[in-house]
């Protein structure tokens, strides 16, 4: 039995991507999750319980954050085992972090075959964007969802979680009925830039994929 008020529906979410892409910054935006996080010493990870209130009741994502281990090579299988969903993050101001996305995806699906995965391009608030919408095609080849995000401004924070919740519950009409308490924005996402990026993504989605066989 879940404790009183404890969400019955829980999912293990693994957050992966190169070091420095903003994974920890992203997960720390959710204030109650940050307050209630637990450290798993055996694996060297922090687990943040992020609760979202939906029209079908509360859902909890137990988000596993690597605490920077990925800087020392790959992650151990124990990190991935029993994951029910994942977010792969790269930094839109760093091309190499996008180039490494296929490696993270490969490690993930080797252990967790058919889980829903969201690809997130973080730091879109920074004007000097290197990885443009038209170059982001990996998700289309692998049937993942993609979102531009800006962790420091809270831009699109809830989008990956809403998409994953709909997939995991099997209800495309699932909605968040209240936003979780988020840390105040450290930067402001320019609304004109956000609108431009959304338009760029829509155009990119309808563009034919390049023919080359490489993963990117």
Swiss-Prot record:
InterPro entries per record: P-loop_NTPase (IPR027417), Ran_GTPase (IPR002041), Small_GTP-bd (IPR005225), Small_GTPase (IPR001806)
Disulfide bonds: none
Family statement drawn from the similarity comment of this UniProt entry: Belongs to the small GTPase superfamily. Ran family.
EC number(s) given by UniProt: 3.6.5.-
Region (Switch-I), start-end ranges: 37-45
Function recorded in the entry: GTPase involved in nucleocytoplasmic transport, participating both to the import and the export from the nucleus of proteins and RNAs. Switches between a cytoplasmic GDP- and a nuclear GTP-bound state by nucleotide exchange and GTP hydrolysis. Nuclear import receptors such as importin beta bind their substrates only in the absence of GTP-bound RAN and release them upon direct interaction with GTP-bound RAN, while export receptors behave in the opposite way.
Cellular localization per UniProt: Nucleus; Nucleus envelope; Cytoplasm, Cytosol; Cytoplasm
GO biological process, one term: snRNA import into nucleus
Location of the region described as Switch-II in the Swiss-Prot/TrEMBL record: 68-84
Cofactor(s) this protein cannot do without: Mg(2+)
Small GTPase Ran-type domain location: 7-171
PROSITE patterns membership: RAN (PS51418)
Keywords, in A-Z order: Cytoplasm, GTP-binding, Hydrolase, Magnesium, Metal-binding, Nucleotide-binding, Nucleus, Protein transport, Transport
UniProt site positions, description: Essential for GTP hydrolysis: 69
Name of the protein described by the UniProt record: GTP-binding nuclear protein Ran
Subunit structure: Monomer. Interacts with RANGAP1, which promotes RAN-mediated GTP hydrolysis. Interacts with KPNB1. Interaction with KPNB1 inhibits RANGAP1-mediated stimulation of GTPase activity. Interacts with RCC1 which promotes the exchange of RAN-bound GDP by GTP. Interaction with KPNB1 inhibits RCC1-mediated exchange of RAN-bound GDP by GTP. Interacts (GTP-bound form) with TNPO1; the interaction is direct. Interacts (GTP-bound form) with TNPO3; the interaction is direct. Interacts with KPNB1 and with TNPO1; both inhibit RAN GTPase activity.
GO molecular function, one term: GDP binding
CDD domains documented for this protein: Ran
Major localization listed first in the record, in broad terms: nucleus
PANTHER family: GTP-BINDING NUCLEAR PROTEIN RAN, RAN GTPASE
Annotated residues for binding of GTP: 18-25, 36-42, 68, 122-125, 150-152
């Amino acid at each position: 039995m879940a404790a009183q008020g404890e969400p019955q529906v829980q999912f293990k979410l693994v957050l992966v991507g190169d070091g420095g892409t903003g994974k920890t910054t992203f997960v720390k935006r959710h204030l109650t999750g940050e307050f209630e996080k637990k450290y798993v010493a055996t694996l060297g990870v922090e687990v943040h319980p992020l609760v979202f209130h939906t029209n079908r009741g509360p859902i909890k994502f137990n988000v596993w954050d690597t605490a920077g281990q990925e800087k020392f090579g790959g992650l151990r299988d124990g990190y991935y085992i029993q994951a029910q969903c994942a977010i792969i993050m790269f930094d839109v101001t760093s091309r190499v972090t996008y180039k490494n996305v296929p490696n993270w995806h490969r490690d993930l699906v080797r252990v967790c075959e058919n889980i829903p995965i969201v690809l997130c391009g973080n730091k879109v608030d920074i004007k000097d964007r290197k990885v443009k919408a038209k170059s982001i095609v990996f998700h289309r080849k692998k049937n993942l969802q993609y979102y531009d995000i800006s962790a420091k401004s809270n831009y699109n924070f809830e989008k990956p979680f809403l998409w994953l919740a709909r997939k995991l519950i099997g209800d495309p009409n699932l909605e968040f009925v209240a936003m979780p308490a988020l840390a105040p924005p450290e930067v402001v996402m320019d609304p004109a830039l956000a609108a431009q990026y959304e338009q760029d993504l829509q155009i990119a989605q309808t563009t034919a994929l390049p023919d080359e066989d490489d993963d990117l």
